[in-house]
Swiss-Prot record:
This is Phototropin-2. It is an enzyme of class 2 (transferase). The keyword Cell wall biogenesis/degradation does not apply. PANTHER family: FLIPPASE KINASE 1-RELATED. It is a peripheral membrane protein. Keywords: ATP-binding, Cell membrane, Chromophore, Disulfide bond, Flavoprotein, FMN, Kinase, Membrane, Nucleotide-binding, Phosphoprotein, Photoreceptor protein, Receptor, Repeat, Sensory transduction, Serine/threonine-protein kinase, Transferase. Protein kinase that acts as a blue light photoreceptor in a signal-transduction pathway for photo-induced movements. Triggers the phosphorylation of AHA1 and AHA2 C-terminal penultimate Thr in guard cells to activate them and induce stomatal opening in response to blue light (BL). Also phosphorylates BLUS1, a kinase involved in stomatal opening. Mediates calcium spiking of extra- and intracellular origins in response to blue light. Involved in hypocotyl phototropism. Autophosphorylated in response to blue light irradiation. It is found in: Cell membrane. The gene is PHOT2. InterPro entries: Kinase-like_dom_sf (IPR011009), PAC (IPR001610), PAS (IPR000014), PAS-assoc_C (IPR000700), PAS-like_dom_sf (IPR035965), Prot_kinase_dom (IPR000719), Protein_kinase_ATP_BS (IPR017441), Ser/Thr_kinase_AS (IPR008271). It comes from Arabidopsis thaliana (Mouse-ear cress). Its cofactor is FMN. Autophosphorylation is inhibited by staurosporine, but not by tyrphostin 9, sphingosine, GW5074 and BML-265.
Length: 915
């Protein structure tokens, strides 16, 4: 018997309307359907014609650019009602629900045969209807895993109706050119209850093929049995390289400068996490959707976080500190989980930081489930990919000078997909009215390897013509040989002089400066990447270079053991080391505890799989890390003892830190926090480590407890430099002004040494909770992002959590940009401690503590009073509630070899581990 539909609540007609319009496919035998209205929004094409002054990457010239960039991370701009000139932001999902609830197209199917397929509860239906993702839910307990729920986006994307898909397996999307190997992978994952993420060619109802980035993940019950599968689809036809991902150069590397599948997979994995958590915590999601109507306004003094506020009792505040982290004995972050975030406490803003109030926060229902996922470093875009201008890069060393990179803005301007552009020559933009004499000038410039700026008529894919101010610029390598051509386009259609039928001289002059500046920025950005024409053996050549000791550590027992091998004429390699145990894994590889055979000396070995590094655009990251570590000679930074490569991996041999990670140390504390004395000690050593890095021109970019290792004596070592940025640094000695004669004292103020990296970067890298605002907005960042991360680190050490964490990446980024900084009143922290955090977490990087005077500004803060900076190496770490746990070699452990299964893990793809 069919369960009657609950009547709409008189208290919330909007919620009732949302429930009726949400897509429901639970009674598949119905012959009656109700089709709701559908609408879709598309991003307006970028013409690249920005006005006004231009920043280095020419992003955010006006509010439209801000809106466009923030929209990529789930935020929508809202014009204020009053005369305020600012822009308010709220999550896109909230804007969509409040502006037009019919956007969630409705299709219902009812039937008297209620037992045909398992029902999904009304509560779950309501929760799922709040999501913006395109996905289906299948019943894993039934043969062929029939679909029992689909989001409205699935119908919009595929063109099918509920009657046509309910009860069916998703294979109806397959067609003649669907890769059978990918289909076999999906079947194997479904059969074994595993996850899958991959791109395959699917077909819409009308036969139109499209590239579908499919992510499948299981939902399991308490006994570990798979009961549902979520299949999330993302149409990536516009931006994927498509079949070009298999196009190779003569050197065996991809013709495309960037491998886009890896980018899209990382975003998809974060997106499906929200779907999974919605199913697992549907009650909280429904409650949040009802109360989530408060807008977030930048720099607002009012409550910034969406959600209903309810005061909590003291007992509730105590539950915040309930132990919940679980770590492996080695301190590895592989399988750690954290329940201490389940009841995050939200405080009202407090400008003077003298008192706080504890207020409940609704968006924290799934934070513990995301703990292990979001602590990994992310690498979402290089500086090159974030230049929002119309440009392409071609390689004249290949036949016909094909395009190997096309910006997203270029795709919008020309209406072509990336798959249609890569591998082609730019002449596809020509048409009937294209002046061939101008085209010949471009050909002559290519032949002569010189730059040229011209204007000509080009055509979009749909046949629309536009006036293109085109700038061609050659790019040469360090030897002066031609490497690439950079082609920048600017749509000048709105500035054509009718009588002359061309751009005016003034417009051409101004626009020429703009396209030339863009080409210069592209030239700088592309140099961060390895030369696409490099032979694979040359790409990893740096890892085969010998390593020699630097002055301060050359007499250590670790170096003496390595030097014995070098003295014998041998090259240090994998065969010299015996695997002991795995220590953990990061974004680019796995870390092993190893022993140098015959010496008893222990080291840490980081192994990175070559194919995975290439597929995920991380080859240059591995090379940068090797270069950086080879320069380090400091007690709070790792020492490189050797680097080498095998046929499949590149390896780095560095210090083994038996104290494990600071993350694990925090985890073991009864309250999951450190005392101020301990936090001060560790923060001080981090400051000194960062000061040394900045002096070398290195921006760390991934400071977090997982990357702070502890030596046996309790002192720190900063680890993992694969996300770091290396540039130049010009040290300065600032002489203080001499005091007046009247006030002259015996002690003269000492000069201040300041050394901060001088160049900006615009890569989108870091760890979600620690990323600085300027990285999210794409405004370009300097070493000031490390001081922001120091503020987050201090907050986590003192309060047991980070201040801006949200239930998903979009919400975390929204919080980082707009949420007021508050402090839990249930945990006493001194005023100077809160003041230091507040000045470090200044959203304006130019006003952030440390941005002008570097580490010296931070050292002088009152929080660090009592720290003897020159002698901090000799200090004993303050006592801890739970002492340091030392990782030791187990004498009874079974001997293992590198050839054994699972010892040197070959991770060739992105992993999904949501459960």
């Amino acid at each position: 018997m069919e369960r009657p539909r609950a009547p709409p609540s008189p208290l919330n007609d909007a919620e009732s309307l949302s429930e009726r319009r949400s897509l429901e496919i639970f009674n598949p035998s119905s012959g009656k359907e109700t089709h709701g209205s559908t609408s879709s929004s598309s991003k307006p094409p970028l013409d690249g014609n920005n006005k006004g002054s231009s920043s280095k990457w020419m992003e955010f010239q006006d509010s439209a650019k801000i809106t466009e960039r923030t929209a990529e991370w789930g935020l929508s701009a809202v014009k204020p009602d009053s005369g305020d000139d600012g822009i308010s932001f709220k999550l896109s999902s909230e804007v969509e629900r409040s502006k037009n609830m019919s956007r969630r197209s409705s299709e219902e199917s009812t039937s008297s045969e209620s037992g045909a397929f398992p029902r999904v509860s009304q509560e779950l239906k309501t929760a799922l209807s709040t999501l913006q993702q395109t996905f289906v839910v299948s019943d894993a307990t039934q043969p062929h895993c029939p679909i029992v729920y689909a989001s409205s986006g699935f119908f919009t994307m595929t063109g099918y109706s509920s009657k046509e898909i309910v009860g069916r397996n998703c294979r109806f999307l397959q067609g003649p050119d669907t890769d059978k190997n990918e289909v076999a992978k999906i079947r194997d994952c479904v059969k074994n209850g595993k996850s899958y993420c991959g791109r395959l060619l699917n077909y819409k109802k009308d036969g139109t093929p499209f590239w579908n980035l499919l992510t499948v993940t299981p939902i399991k019950d308490d006994q570990g049995n798979t009961i549902k599968f979520i299949g999330m689809q993302v149409e990536v036809s516009k931006y994927t390289e498509g079949v070009n991902d298999k196009a190779l150069r003569p050197n065996g590397l991809s013709k495309s400068l960037i491998r886009y599948d890896a980018r899209q997979k990382e975003k998809a994995l974060d997106s499906i996490t929200e779907v999974v958590q919605t199913i697992r915590h549907r009650k909280s999601q429904v409650q949040e959707s009802v109360s989530n109507d408060t807008m977030v306004k930048p720099d607002s003094s009012t409550t910034p976080t969406p959600g209903r506020q309810t005061r909590q009792s003291d007992e509730a505040s105590k539950s915040f500190r309930t132990p919940g982290r679980v770590s492996t004995p080695t301190g590895s972050k592989l399988k750690s989980s954290n329940n201490r975030h389940e009841d995050l406490l939200r405080m009202e803003p407090e400008e003077l930081m003298l008192s706080t109030e504890v207020i409940g926060q609704r968006d924290s229902w799934d934070l513990s489930d995301r703990e292990r996922d979001i602590r990994q470093g992310i690498d979402l875009a290089t500086t090159l990919e974030r230049i929002e201008k119309n440009f392409v890069i071609s390689d004249p060393r290949l036949p016909d000078n094909p395009i190997i990179f096309a910006s997203d803005s270029f795709l919008e301007l020309t209406e072509y997909s990336r798959e249609e552009i890569l591998g082609r020559n730019c002449r596809f933009l020509q048409g009937p009215e294209t002046d061939q004499a101008t085209v010949q000038k471009i050909r002559d410039a290519i032949r002569d390897q010189r730059e040229i700026t011209v204007q000509l008529i080009n055509y979009t894919k749909s046949g629309k013509k536009f006036w293109n101010l085109f700038h061609l610029q050659p790019m040469r390598d360090q030897k002066g040989e031609l490497q690439y051509f950079i082609g920048v386009q600017l749509d000048g259609s709105d500035h054509v002089e009718p009588l002359q039928n061309r751009l005016s001289e003034r417009t051409e002059m101004q626009s020429s400066k703009l396209v030339k500046a863009t080409a210069t920025n592209v030239d700088e950005a592309v140099r961060e990447l390895p030369d696409a024409n490099t032979r694979p053996e040359d790409l990893w050549a740096a890892h085969s270079k010998p390593v020699y000791p630097l002055p301060h550590n050359k007499e250590s027992t670790s170096w003496k053991a390595i030097k014995k091998i070098q003295a014998s004429g041998e090259t240090v390699g994998l065969h010299h080391f015996k695997p002991i145990k795995p220590l953990g894994s990061g974004d680019t590889g796995s870390v092993h505890l190893v022993e140098l055979k015959g010496t008893g000396e222990l080291y840490a070995m980081k192994a990175m799989e070559k194919t995975m590094m290439l597929n995920r655009n991380k080859a240059h990251r591995a090379c940068i890390e090797r270069e950086i570590i080879s320069l380090l000679d400091h007690p709070f930074l790792p020492t490189l003892y050797a680097s080498f490569q095998t046929s499949t991996h590149v390896c780095l041999i560095t210090d083994f830190c038996p104290g494990g990670e600071l993350f694990a140390l925090l985890d073991r504390q009864p309250m999951k926090i450190l005392t101020e004395d301990s936090a001060r000690f560790y923060a001080a050593e981090v400051v000194i480590g960062l000061e040394y890095l900045h002096c070398l021109g290195i921006v760390y970019r991934d400071l977090k407890p997982e990357n702070i290792l502890l030596k046996k004596d309790g002192h720190i070592v900063l680890a993992d430099f694969d996300l770091s940025f290396m540039t130049t640094c010009t040290p300065q000695l600032i002489i203080p002004a001499a005091p007046s004669k009247r006030r002259r004292s015996k002690s003269q103020p000492l000069p201040t040494f300041v050394a901060e990296p001088s160049t900006q970067s615009n890569s989108f890298v870091g760890t979600e909770e620690y990323i600085a605002p300027e990285i999210i907005t794409g405004a370009g960042h300097t070493s000031a992002i490390d001081w922001w991360a120091l503020g987050i680190l201090l907050y986590e050490m003192l309060y047991g959590r980070t201040p801006f964490r949200g239930k998903n990446r979009q919400k975390t980024f929204a919080n980082i940009l707009h949420k007021d900084l508050t402090f839990p009143s249930s945990i006493p922290v001194s005023l100077v401690g809160r003041q230091l955090i507040n000045t470090l977490l200044n959203r304006d990087p130019s006003s952030r503590l440390g941005s002008k005077g570097g580490a010296n500004e931070i050292k002088q803060h009152a929080f660090f009073r009592g720290i003897n900076w020159p002698l901090i190496r000799g200090m004993s770490p303050p006592p801890l509630d739970a002492p340091l746990s030392i990782i030791e070699k187990d004498p009874n452990a079974k001997d293992i070899k590198w050839e054994d299964d699972g010892v040197l893990v070959n991770s060739t793809d992105l992993d999904i581990d949501l459960f």
